């Protein structure tokens, strides 16, 4: 009986260690640099509205109306997602951690561009080479929330 308990405790400890290892270390260079977000690395596990190449490029979250209201709405939308935790917030910048079903952590960043009528985005996996399109799909899911879909439709 005691051996069984020890095995279960060890198994739970190993599982917890594996899940923690999946989180990876937060990159120290995230944030706003010279008024913009970092470019994506060459690996395909990142998307950015500031990227020039098609592989990494994703459209920003566009809106019509008050920029502060749009950014506030984003701040309210993100925590509704069970995989999302806001970890840094200023009046124009948000950094979030997205947790995948397998326990991996991806970093998301949102930068308000009030003059451009959009919120620039960057989403990147901490570990691995490919994300199988997860970062792109996640940003597109967020885009479908108000007020972004209305602005998308009006801009077309």
Give the residues covered by each predicted segment:
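Sec-dependent bacterial lipoprotein signal peptides
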Residues: 1-20
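Ser/Thr-rich, low-complexity intrinsically disordered terminal regions
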Residues: 22-156
